């Protein structure tokens, strides 16, 4: 180009986006006057981890994260009390419900039933349209979380009491212990607990692994058992809830980061929707590791039907041996039906120089119970039980009870 403008380097600058001084003063006034502050953070906290931890220390505030904030909030955070929402922990739910002030940072958390009643709410978001969109708020601040917290921090006074924080931390420790107690080899019984699969994947994967997760039950186990450390990534269709996203997301992640380990936690329903993309792994020599949660069902749909009091129908899946399919394509492939074989199978798959498919037969009736169950949901489960028996399918109900009650009593 004769003008030469395309040859000139682009000099990037960093913009600062924060509320005005009056907005910051009002936020500080509310937070300083509160006795039980809880912080709810989302994906907007990316790049503001240290500022968030410093703020939580000043306010003695437990920090709860929404799903999309998990990878940016929970690591190296002594104030973390887990996640809230349908996939979350009882500790996160309770820390929010017991707050007299909720500080929302970079989150458009949609579930109104998980917000506190009667608490004051301050919301910070770079997108002004998100302010007050999900719940009534007392103060909305437009700005990035990083810039806003940097300007807000000097206006805050150190809270003398840790009562609310320590109570929330104790509850989280108890909840975490209970959850981790489910991610075990269940006395070598088959089918395998999905919690155990996710727990092993977490332990065996590399420190900078990129995890991609299918919508449905795999995202539940990923949210509860994958540990983020500031280097790992967690990718999924967390806004739109699109099925079959784990494999294509993994293809994209592996292409973008060829030197990193990419692990796809796929549901059997999701994987079969885009089965042909397994060939893409071979054709493009992408060493993605695919772990299939094979429960022969659209598992999360079944859970929603149970909660609505509907007897399951149209959710059965007749699956092939996914490990054999992988081998037929030229990839590493293994099927695991017994928990004692799982760790070695995952170890071998992760060490394989190329794409790998591990087909894990998991418990169909394992319930991903939310942190709080409404009266309507409890009524729905009761109706499901009655209607299932009346339909002559009492064996399904027995399997449900055995999987979720008996095993927990024995552990």
Give short role names for the model-derived ranges.
Residues 98-110, 220-298:
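Thiamine diphosphate
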Residues 23-37, 96-98, 200-209, 254-259, ...:
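Glycine-rich phosphate/diphosphate-binding loops that line cofactor/substrate pockets in enzymes
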Residues 1-31, 180, 184:
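Conformationally flexible catalytic loops at phosphate/diphosphate-handling active centers
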Residues 173-248, 253, 259:
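Active-site diphosphate/adenylate-binding microenvironment
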Residues 15, 69-170, 346, 350:
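Glycine-rich, acidic loop regions that bind phosphate or pyrophosphate groups
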Residues 1-17, 113, 345-411:
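Glycine/aspartate-rich loop-and-adjacent alpha/beta segment that forms the canonical ThDP
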Residues 19-26, 32-33, 319, 330-357, ...:
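Glycine-rich ThDP/TPP pyrophosphate-binding loop and its adjacent helix/strand module
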Residues 98-99, 148, 154, 305-345:
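Conserved thiamine diphosphate
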